[in-house]
Design a protein with these regions (language model features):
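Acidic, metal/ion-coordinating pockets
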Residues: 1-246
Length: 246
């Protein structure tokens, strides 16, 4: 029997108290078979302004031990310099599989997927971001970036991930309703760790065989999703919320 744990936050908006950071780090360090993920909008900046020196909360998250995050709408910027500045202090992968750019080199700071080996399991994490610019928008004429529909992007990528991964996690910043549409449209995703809608889910939302989880907003809670795989291959999911408030 194998136990695999996903610790997750979303929509921090720059709010990560010292107490919250200590609890998250303690939970991460107490488990040898876990990953710590963030489902986007960790930073406080909006879509126009950016700090040239970077976002300090990403340094704190790296110090805590975050393994990856998905780019939320707050991490995105329509200029290449802005996007790079926003995420440059993250010492962990920042994901989005549905961002597109005129030259790959200008969004090399964003990767579509990352794979971890945990307790002998291959765990693939796929990032999906709410589309901020589409090709039909006027903004696409001045920005080097545009976004593909996240569900279409997942349909293209998940089958190839399934060939090599034991577990597939969609780390999304698209909102609960679209998470449910994603799970219904794309088979092979085990767990959706979501953000954007600020949904506080005390239990997973199930769509077919896919569990959807989300942990509210502003660092009030840490989500804990425990996946148990029996020797016969049967999988069970248990979720809980850890209160991080002062």
């Amino acid at each position: 029997m194998l136990d695999f744990v996903i610790l997750h936050t979303n929509d921090l908006h720059g709010k990560l108290s010292q107490q919250a950071a200590e609890i998250i780090a303690r939970e991460k360090n107490s488990c040898d078979t876990c990953i710590l993920l963030d489902a986007g909008d960790a930073i406080p900046s909006g879509n126009i302004y950016w700090r040239p020196w970077g976002e300090p909360i990403l340094c704190r998250m790296a110090d805590i031990g975050y393994d990856a995050m998905v780019m939320g709408n707050r991490e995105f910027h329509f200029l290449a310099a802005g996007l790079e500045s926003k995420v440059k202090l993250a010492r962990f992968p920042v994901l989005s599989a549905n961002i597109r750019c005129t030259k790959r080199s200008i969004c090399s700071c964003i990767v579509p997927t990352v794979t971890f080996c945990i307790a002998g399991l291959s765990v693939a994490v796929l990032g999906l971001t709410v589309p901020m610019i589409t090709k039909q928008m006027l903004a696409a004429k001045i920005s080097p970036f545009w976004f593909e529909d996240p569900i279409s992007a997942a349909k293209d990528i998940v089958p190839s991930l399934r060939d090599n991964a034991d577990i597939i996690i969609a780390l999304t910043h698209i909102g609960l309703r679209t998470d449910m549409e994603l799970a219904a449209a794309v088979s092979g995703i085990d767990i959706v760790v979501g953000g954007h809608s600020h949904s506080l889910l005390s239990e997973p939302v199930w769509v077919d065989d896919t569990a959807i989880v989300q942990a509210g907003y502003w660092g009030h809670y840490l989500g804990k999703t425990e996946l148990t795989i029996s020797s016969a291959g049967k999988r069970t999911v248990h979720t809980s919320l850890i209160d991080l408030r002062d």
